[in-house]
Amino acid sequence: MEGLPLAKANVEAVVRIQTWLEASIRAHQTVGVETVLSTDKYRRLVTEAKQRQFAVRLFFVMLNSPDLNVQRVRLRVEKGGHDVPEESIRKRWNRSLAQLPWFLDQSDQAAIYDNSGAVPRLVGRKQNGATVVDPDAPLAFREALGLLAGPDRK
């Protein structure tokens, strides 16, 4: 995609990876996808993989707040990495958590990590159909899974 304007190159890259993923699943080849999970575009892919008897494994790495996401992107930019507008970071953080329950439900195994501290911490997992969540997992994660109710939502 050399020589293309950045926006056009990004679109071309998305089309190519989607085509490759679909072909890989049809050929029953193992695939892995990294995404911020801020859209539902991979739902169809997961559904097709499940229909073709793939085991679906989810590794979800989160931060405990959109503010921390903004800070991490600023640090990345300071080190020469790419920038993302703050508004986009905040929207994606919320949409990612909104998408999580569906993908967790579809997964055969899952591990959810809170990467807010110096060391990532396992805060949830799914195995053999059972999902276990650390009671000290970030509030937003527990809310996304509908684990909080009543006036004492801590």
Regions of interest found by a model, annotated:
Residues 1-29:
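Conserved substrate/cofactor phosphate-moiety recognition/catalytic segment
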Residues 33-43, 63:
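Acidic, metal-coordinating catalytic cores used for nucleic-acid/nucleotide bond scission
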